[in-house]
């Protein structure tokens, strides 16, 4: 069978790589893919207009694609799943309506309140002046969020009123996030430890994936600007059995049932970004796709077929489906371009290791091939990922792989995983 993965990041390299491991899969097309997917066995990059759903559907029909996995959020929010499913193409990803959980912070916060899902207190504004007046009524620190999709960078933690004013000016007046910043959510700052809970969902059925913890801030010690994520590890020790069950009971189940009540039953990866403190959980955000970089360490631990899992969800057969994980730990460290998450230079020549040790994988993100050479083409360039008998060993192997990759302006956080090492 043939699979099509939509996207070009580290997440999509991991999804395509994992799909290719299924013996039944003969070819995985990646659109548009990156240098990593171009170099993998059984993978092939293709160039299609991702805004032209008809062109994608025609390709799927002509190539007899058995499964489409949509990686990034933008095509989901634009309704790619709806279009392809209407053409009888097996597509794994939520509908346009269900993807509003990620597409609009205001929609998601209102949804949380309506269905009793624990979250931080908030207020939403589509006017700079009203948002500014609200700052006089709240305590600091606070969190200012652009309402729409901002590639994981639209969340600004403000320690003072002055910082919050600057954030609002950046969003409303400078239009830093474009249309995504036409309205904002201002919410209470939550303390605690973050965790990522990602599950495969089909209507009211759920298979939780391995837990993980992301590192959003650009700098060591979680300081600096928010990014799409600078590294992740799995499992996350903070999610013990009690917390795990609590997340399913208080977050995932009411979300699934709420979406059914709204007429938008969910299909796809559903990712809850959580804050955990003293055994209590609150939802920071929902993402309607696999996290990046969480995908890379999580899929390194998955022993079962990803393709069979996705097809079981599409065919409403999750209830009888089981998946298997390695007991080993994994750690993924992002290597980024100097200047990320703000402006950075591209087209830097990359030096890669000739071989890597067992149980390690270098996933490409912002890379491209030019005359058989690998060049940088994005802010996050690689995710060096490794398995180990414990997190400390996985971390050491991941950083050992990081040291073998070089390009001008490369940087990475040196503390990925330390929170999970006791």
PLM regions with names:
Residues 158-295:
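Internal nucleotide-binding/catalytic subdomain
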Residues 367-371, 375-422:
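Generic C-terminus detector
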Residues 248-270, 287-359, 370:
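Active-site "cap" helix and flanking loop/linker of ATP-utilizing ligase/carboxylase catalytic domains
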Residues 39-41, 55-57, 100-106, 219-220:
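Short, charged, surface-exposed secondary-structure boundary motifs
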Residues 4-5, 101-183, 213, 237, ...:
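Active-site nucleotide/adenylate-binding loops and adjacent lid/helix of ATP-dependent enzymes
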Residues 21, 38-39, 92, 114-116, ...:
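Solvent-exposed alpha-helices and their adjacent loops that cap or buttress functional pockets
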Residues 1-96:
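ATP-binding N-terminal substructure of ATP-dependent carboxylate-amine bond-forming enzymes
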């Amino acid at each position: 069978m043939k699979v099509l993965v939509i996207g070009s990041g580290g997440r999509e390299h991991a999804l395509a790589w994992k799909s290719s491991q299924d013996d039944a899969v003969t070819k995985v097309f990646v659109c548009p893919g990156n240098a990593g997917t171009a170099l993998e066995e059984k993978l092939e990059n293709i160039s299609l207009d991702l805004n032209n759903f008809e062109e994608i559907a025609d390709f799927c029909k002509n190539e007899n694609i058995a499964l489409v996995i949509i990686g990034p959020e933008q095509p989901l929010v634009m309704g790619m799943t709806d279009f392809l499913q209407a053409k009888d193409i097996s597509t794994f990803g939520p509908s346009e309506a269900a993807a509003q959980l990620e597409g609009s912070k205001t929609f998601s916060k209102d949804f949380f309140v309506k269905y009793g899902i624990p979250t931080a207190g908030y207020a939403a504004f589509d006017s700079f002046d009203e948002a500014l007046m609200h700052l006089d009524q709240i305590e600091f620190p606070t969190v200012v969020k652009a309402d729409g999709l901002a590639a994981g960078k639209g969340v600004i933690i403000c320690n003072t009123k002055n910082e919050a004013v600057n954030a609002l000016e950046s969003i409303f007046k400078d239009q830093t996030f474009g249309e995504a910043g036409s309205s904002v959510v201002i919410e209470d700052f939550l303390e605690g430890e973050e965790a990522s809970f990602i599950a495969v969902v089909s209507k009211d059925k759920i298979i939780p994936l391995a837990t993980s913890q992301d590192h959003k801030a650009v700098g060591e010690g979680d300081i600096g600007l928010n990014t799409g994520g600078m590294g992740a590890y799995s499992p996350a020790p903070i999610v013990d059995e009690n917390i795990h069950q609590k997340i399913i009971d208080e977050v995932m189940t009411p979300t699934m049932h709420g979406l059914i009540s709204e007429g938008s039953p969910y299909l796809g990866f559903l990712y809850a970004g959580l804050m955990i403190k003293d055994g209590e959980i609150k939802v920071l955000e929902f993402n309607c796709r696999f996290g990046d970089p969480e995908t890379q360490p999580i899929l390194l631990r998955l022993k079962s077929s990803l393709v069979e899992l996705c097809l079981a969800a599409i065919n409403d057969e999750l209830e009888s489906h089981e998946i298997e994980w390695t007991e080993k730990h994994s750690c993924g460290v992002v290597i980024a371009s100097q200047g990320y998450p703000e402006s950075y230079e591209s087209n830097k020549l990359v030096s890669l290791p000739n071989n890597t040790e067992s149980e390690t994988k270098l996933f490409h993100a912002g890379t491209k091939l030019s005359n058989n050479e690998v060049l940088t083409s994005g802010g996050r360039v690689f995710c060096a990922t490794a398995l180990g008998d414990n997190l400390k060993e996985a971390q050491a192997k991941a950083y050992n792989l990081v040291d073998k990759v070089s390009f001008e302006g490369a940087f990475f956080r040196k503390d990925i995983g330390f929170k999970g090492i006791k």
